[in-house]
Design a protein with these regions (language model features):
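Vicinal oxygen chelate
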Residues: 1-6, 12, 37-38, 45-47, ...
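Acidic di-acidic motifs
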Residues: 19, 81, 128
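Short beta-strand segments
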Residues: 56-58, 134
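Short beta-strand/turn micro-motifs at beta-sheet edges
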Residues: 1-3, 61-64
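Residue-level signature for short turns and capping positions that connect secondary-structure elements
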Residues: 54, 63-65, 141
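Helix-adjacent hinge/juxtasegments
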Residues: 62-85
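Core segments of cupin and vicinal oxygen chelate
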Residues: 5-8, 14-56, 84, 91
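Residue-level recognition of conserved beta-strand positions in structured domain cores
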Residues: 51, 60-62, 138
Length: 145
């Protein structure tokens, strides 16, 4: 074993959906790239899509997961400008929340951006047609590390 860990890059997150074609249309409308749409045996089908600028993709389909449709909550999408991201997604048909921040870690949501404007503090949210939920997190400057 060396002192340097191997690269472990998150590639795919699986989303449980009830209607594959509806989900594909929804994510396409948001500008996500269709990487694959493969049928398999016995009704299996997997769709892979990737958000603009992301190295990580999503999978959904038929017989892809046993999780209940809509059961995935708070997947993070990092953006550099929360208001620009909100406008873009809303213009593409997503029902995006107003910007909000948290009173404290684990605390309740508070309307409006994080008062100091610091990175990692301002959010907005939206859900897909099944209720899988996404958080937009504004990061202007990444913390070191």
């Amino acid at each position: 074993m060396s002192g340097i860990p191997v690269d472990l890059k998150l590639e795919v997150v699986v989303l449980p959906v009830s209607d594959v074609d509806r989900s594909k249309r929804f994510y396409e409308s948001l500008g996500w790239r269709v990487d694959a749409d493969f049928p398999g045996v016995d009704g299996f089908r997997v769709v892979q899509m990737t958000p603009p600028g992301s190295p990580c993709s999503i999978h959904f389909g038929k017989k892809v997961t046993t999780a209940a449709p809509g059961s995935i909550k708070n997947l993070y999408l990092v953006v550099s400008d929360i208001e620009a991201a909100r406008r873009d997604l809303a213009g593409r048909g997503a029902d995006v929340s107003e910007a909000f921040h948290f009173e404290a870690f684990g605390g309740p949501r508070v309307p409006g951006p994080e008062p100091s404007g610091r990175s990692y503090g301002t959010y907005a949210s939206f859900s897909d047609p099944d209720g899988n939920s996404w958080l937009l997190q504004e990061i202007k400057t990444r913390l070191p590390g």
